[in-house]
Regions:
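Histidine-acidic metal/acid-base catalytic patches
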Residues: 1-8, 15-29, 53-60, 106, ...
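N-terminal substrate-binding region of glycoside hydrolase catalytic domains
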Residues: 10, 28-49, 70-81
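Active-site beta-loop-alpha junctions enriched in small/polar residues
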Residues: 10-14, 36-38, 71-74, 121-123, ...
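Glycine-rich, proline-tolerant flexible connector loops at the mouths of alpha/beta enzymes
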Residues: 36-56, 120-127
């Protein structure tokens, strides 16, 4: 049988109530929408069973499946250098966000998914001191993670996968430029050292490229292939990487080698969801931006 791409959507970018967002996603052709927290529904990490059931009913109403459940952005803003090795579980912010992540694990299957989302800590000063390590990271194609810091990451995510085993769910890590899994090499080292099949990745080729990783289509794909369960679909143009000068553009109109990536996914028969996002501005608004990216994605798929 010919390879069929599964298409999802990060519906927070639509800035619509969830009911309308799911309807829009379905209309645009995305069968696997997902969200982080909801303005009308509160924090996933503090959600009641009844609230979760209402959301599951909305998904059933539109005949769509939740790609993953995200309790906000667990660990995204925690500066790793401020976390003490050996006592990660006692760090106040980690402790709070870990509890939210565990609650998402408790709710995941109730809401129709077996995957929850997590992030991988901030590089030093990333959100507090204007990204002081960025020039070094760009020059080294993603940065250098010390053994001490990698050890902390491994400790943290071994705690996470212990809970994932308990609740029989997978944990998909994001690949943000501002976090430690900003490249496929960094993710692969962390995943291999944690050593759990529970750990997955929402691969972000655009973010990898934006961090200076040179070959996201082939070497990058090879690095993430054993772990990838979804792909963050957006495009960008890097103007001057050393000073973080880049522009988000419609899918297929930037620097990211998406044609090669989609081809490789099909050749490998990868069981992944293409999670459509935008990030660029459209004169007719957010839904129009998502429609533009969906149209471009479908055209590229048809051309393979």
């Amino acid at each position: 049988m010919p390879y069929e791409f599964k298409i999802g959507m990060y519906v927070n970018e639509l800035r619509l109530p969830l009911d309308d967002a799911l309807a829009t996603a379905k209309e645009l052709g995305a069968d696997y929408p997902w969200f982080t927290n909801l303005d009308e529904g509160g924090h996933v990490g503090q959600m009641s069973d009844a609230e979760a059931d209402k959301i599951a009913e909305l998904y059933a109403k539109y005949d769509v499946k939740m790609m993953q459940l995200s309790a906000g952005s667990p660990f995204k803003f925690i500066d790793l250098v401020e976390v003490s090795a050996g006592s990660i579980g006692e760090h106040p912010t980690f402790k709070e966000e870990f509890s939210h992540l565990i609650r998402s694990m408790e709710l995941a299957k109730r809401m129709g998914t077996d995957t929850v989302a997590a992030y991988t800590f901030a590089w030093p000063g990333e959100y507090t001191a204007d990204k002081p390590t960025w020039p070094m990271r760009w020059a080294t194609q993603g940065g250098i993670i010390s053994e001490v810091e990698m050890g902390k990451l491994v400790q943290a995510f071994k705690l996470v996968v212990e809970q994932a085993d308990r609740y029989d769910v997978n944990v998909s890590l994001a690949m943000m430029p501002w976090n430690y899994t900003n490249t496929t090499l960094h993710f692969r080292e962390l995943a291999d050292r944690v050593g759990s099949d529970r750990l997955k990745v929402m691969w972000g080729p655009a973010d990898n490229y934006n961090c200076g990783e040179p070959d996201v289509a082939t070497a990058g794909f090879s690095n993430v292939q054993p772990y990838v369960d979804s792909i963050h679909i957006k495009d960008l143009r890097v103007n001057d990487g050393a000073i973080i000068d880049f522009d988000y553009v419609p899918f297929g109109e930037g620097d990211v080698p998406w044609q090669d990536i989609l081809h490789n996914l099909g050749e490998a028969n990868s069981d992944v969801v293409l999670s459509l996002a935008t990030h660029f501005e459209h004169p007719q608004g957010r839904v129009a931006a998502m429609q533009k990216n969906m149209d471009n994605l479908q055209q590229m798929i048809a051309s393979l």
